[in-house]
Amino acid sequence: MDVNPTLLFLKVPAQNAISTTFPYTGDPPYSHGTGTGYTMDTVNRTHQYSEKGKWTTNTETGAPQLNPIDGPLPEDNEPSGYAQTDCVLEAMAFLEESHPGIFENSCLETMEVVQQTRVDKLTQGRQTYDWTLNRNQPAATALANTIEVFRSNGLTANESGRLIDFLKDVMESMDKEGMEITTHFQRKRRVRDNMTKKMVTQRTIGKKKQRLNKRSYLIRALTLNTMTKDAERGKLKRRAIATPGMQIRGFVYFVETLARSICEKLEQSGLPVGGNEKKAKLANVVRKMMTNSQDTELSFTITGDNTKWNENQNPRMFLAMITYITRNQPEWFRNVLSIAPIMFSNKMARLGKGYMFESKSMKLRTQIPAEMLANIDLKYFNESTRKKIEKIRPLLIDGTASLSPGMMMGMFNMLSTVLGVSILNLGQKRYTKTTYWWDGLQSSDDFALIVNAPNHEGIQAGVDRFYRTCKLVGINMSKKKSYINRTGTFEFTSFFYRYGFVANFSMELPSFGVSGINESADMSIGVTVIKNNMINNDLGPATAQMALQLFIKDYRYTYRCHRGDTQIQTRRSFELKKLWEQTRSKAGLLVSDGGPNLYNIRNLHIPEVCLKWELMDEDYQGRLCNPLNPFVSHKEIESVNNAVVMPAHGPAKSMEYDAVATTHSWIPKRNRSILNTSQRGILEDEQMYQKCCNLFEKFFPSSSYRRPVGISSMVEAMVSRARIDARIDFESGRIKKEEFAEIMKICSTIEELRRQK
């Protein structure tokens, strides 16, 4: 049946159809090759926006640095990073005046966090620049490597396990004359394979000691590694994002904790809340502006866009903000918080992998690493790349570019939101002292501005004043990309508002479908996504029912588990037909075993195993959920798991789904090819780390898991815990005397071994 698409929209208000124009179906674009070019663009643009600043040289690293703070006031509409310190401080003061005690209280909350946070907070997060190996690693490995190197260089404060003590080590490491690190390297040898008698290349991984002098160490500690941002929809060009090393991360975490605490208390802040809570917060601001504008005033809203938010922000400005916010706090606290912006003022951007050259005639490929860009002959490059390299050369040191101004993407989202809100806060009548006034919403670089005034001239004047005020603190509202509308219709962080938020359903499209984890998780995630969209995104019952049928169809094709009585032939049909025929209660078979689908929109919240349990044959139940069955994964016994789903904008979200361990919740094995590469040592470290953590969690179930205070090690904690538990179990008669004696003996042996080591 052919459908004329326009018919679909006859009954749909225009604003609800907006979601159909979004580039959210199909695969998002990914980048290939190196991000070196994008990173050079970022560095060059950032310097261009601040070009009228003052140049200085960092005495420790020799890096040239540009400081645009308190630079010339802009005379045109070009984006610029010349923030004025006194203006920023005044904006902070007014923000505090409108919210008495806000900074004081947030500082107290943060101080508590600083004293309690454990160093394992830094293991969260994905790829992290590992300064010991000079490339990216999983966060946990990068942290373990850093601590290992610190300890071998005599820095041991981190052994307490508190993040603040680890940061003391970081500070001390920067004063040392040098650091000795262990790097991994590969040896290749040609050997004859005993089985096939062919020559094969054998790789072995060696570790070697290397000494970094103070300058080289500082450069690495201040380095942000760069990559290309993947899967960005609706953009023609890719852009670079940064990942900082372990020295910077802890300090950034505390600054963001403080800023988050402030944002939570600001009604104009779109962070740190999300989803429905965010919509409610925004709706309140709009309601306030609309009720106040009744009949006498006009009210207009700007859907705002800022030009290159990060590249015009400045760490020195953040330092000024922190200095003001913490002005009555103890010295140690002020110092800890001021380090992150200071490090960012001296940051270095690593240019990534470099360029790949191909010679068509000779079929040769060669890579020019970033380190060589400083002195390679430019005749090999095309025009645009040549310009980039020429511009960046004065800034290069060891394959990294000095980048003092600007804040790479996503580093201080909360703190920059505080800055944005402080300007929105100045829109109150008591500050504008005229007939117009404004309010709005800010979420990192995205904003919506609502201006009220008696007439159109007043609205224009209000917008102009807002625009100029922003310029004074390094925020550049884009006149080309922002648009103004009567209040009641605007967009903010991809939420569309029209007398209330309309569901932008297309954003959720990428998360529908089969995730590809395993049969059990995929079924559970699939129905949970549909359920969540019925709750949050206006997914109606008929559409949800259709989505469910499409999902089941997709699922059956993915896992080749068509119903046992179907005619479709796949490589699993023989086994599934056999199972179907010998099953008495066919309704009890899981869909992944060729059973019928019993889901409808009323029972999406029930895991499939539970839904069908009463209908299953007894022997089927026994095979499916028998803990002795070697295929039943008992890695997670918790009833809730987390899946990563990809909404269309923003980072991948974590979504909870019910997990029931059955023969279908298998975990695929790691690809073996990694075992022959230089990553192997790292993989083994990671598994070791994982095993220790899992073991530790077995001893401390989450209910009783109070993180050990003081400097007892993990092993000591586990031994003492084992002794306490054993005594309780023995006295209550749960274990026999012999078992109790054996446990005590094992504990003593472990302690003895530790003493010998």
Swiss-Prot record:
It is found in: Host nucleus; Host cytoplasm. The keyword Transferase applies. Influenza RNA polymerase is composed of three subunits: PB1, PB2 and PA. Interacts (via N-terminus) with PA (via C-terminus). Interacts (via C-terminus) with PB2 (via N-terminus); this interaction is essential for transcription initiation. Residues 50-82 are annotated as: Disordered. GO terms for cellular component: host cell cytoplasm; host cell nucleus. It comes from the Viruses. It catalyses: RNA(n) + a ribonucleoside 5'-triphosphate = RNA(n+1) + diphosphate. GO terms for molecular function: nucleotide binding; RNA binding; RNA-directed RNA polymerase activity. Residues 286-483 form the RdRp catalytic domain. Residues 55-64 have a biased composition (Polar residues). RNA-dependent RNA polymerase which is responsible for replication and transcription of virus RNA segments. The transcription of viral mRNAs occurs by a unique mechanism called cap-snatching. 5' methylated caps of cellular mRNAs are cleaved after 10-13 nucleotides by PA. In turn, these short capped RNAs are used as primers by PB1 for transcription of viral mRNAs. During virus replication, PB1 initiates RNA synthesis and copy vRNA into complementary RNA (cRNA) which in turn serves as a template for the production of more vRNAs. Pfam families: Flu_PB1 (PF00602). Transmembrane segments: none annotated. It comes from Influenza A virus (strain A/Turkey/Minnesota/501/1978 H6N8). InterPro entries: RNA-dir_pol_NSvirus, RNA_pol_PB1_influenza. Phosphorylated by host PRKCA. This is RNA-directed RNA polymerase catalytic subunit. Its main location: host cell. Its EC number is 2.7.7.48. Residues 249-256 are annotated as: Promoter-binding site. A motif (Nuclear localization signal) lies at residues 187-195, 203-216. Keywords: Eukaryotic host gene expression shutoff by virus, Eukaryotic host transcription shutoff by virus, Host cytoplasm, Host gene expression shutoff by virus, Host nucleus, Host-virus interaction, Inhibition of host RNA polymerase II by virus, Nucleotide-binding, Nucleotidyltransferase, Phosphoprotein, RNA-directed RNA polymerase, Transferase, Viral RNA replication, Viral transcription. The gene is PB1. Belongs to the influenza viruses polymerase PB1 family. The keyword Protein biosynthesis does not apply.
